[in-house]
UniProtKB/Swiss-Prot annotation:
MF term (GO), any: adenine binding
Gene3D superfamilies: 3.40.50.2020
CDD domains registered for this protein in UniProt: PRTases_typeI
Protein name, UniProt field: Adenine phosphoribosyltransferase
Function: Catalyzes a salvage reaction resulting in the formation of AMP, that is energically less costly than de novo synthesis.
Protein's organism: Bacillus licheniformis (strain ATCC 14580 / DSM 13 / JCM 2505 / CCUG 7422 / NBRC 12200 / NCIMB 9375 / NCTC 10341 / NRRL NRS-1264 / Gibson 46)
Length: 170
């Protein structure tokens, strides 16, 4: 299935010059969303995943159905102040500054094989920070899956040494 035909390109959003990839027009078609999810599930089964981890917010909508299909848990990675219990955190760079990502301190057991999911690989900063959180808790990043990769931003370079699946490339 050609998933790209279900992604809407929104010009000049959120700012001029950006060609935003809107995945809601993929997700609102059950058969297409299921197909995309199934592709990631097939990849994850080969990796013998124990847990799926995804950064907010679109990492949740990719990762939760994958975790459900695999029969494993899902651990959210959130911005600082959004998780209610004890967390570990990591600073990461944004285009114009820094932000902080957190995960519950007990979300991952040492040695667990983790699949990280997100909707989009752009610069790689969010996933690089997510990897740091997973590994700090003793998890093993067995794979990383995205719906879309923006190849011209070269985010894959920050993830060198990790196995990556992308379903679409722009």
């Amino acid at each position: 299935m050609d998933l790209k035909k279900y992604v809407t390109i929104v010009p000049d959003y959120p700012k001029e010059g950006v060609q935003f990839k809107d995945i809601t027009t993929l997700m609102d078609k059950g058969d297409v969303y299921r197909y995309a999810t199934d592709q990631i599930v097939t990849y994850a089964k080969e990796k013998e995943i124990d847990l799926v981890v995804g950064p907010e917010a679109r990492g949740f909508i990719i990762g939760c159905p994958v975790a459900y299909a695999l029969g494993v848990g899902f651990a959210p990675v959130r911005k600082e102040g959004k998780l209610p219990r004890e967390v570990i955190k990591v600073d990461y760079g944004l285009e114009y500054g820094k932000d902080v990502l957190t995960i519950h301190k007990d979300a991952i057991k040492p040695g667990q094989r983790v699949l990280i999911t997100d909707d989009l690989l752009a610069t790689g900063g969010t996933i690089e920070a997510t990897i740091k959180l997973v590994e700090e808790l003793g998890g093993v990043v067995a794979g990383i899956a995205f719906l879309i990769e923006l190849t011209y931003l070269e985010g894959r370079n920050k993830l060198d040494g990790y196995d990556i699946l992308t379903l679409m490339q722009y």
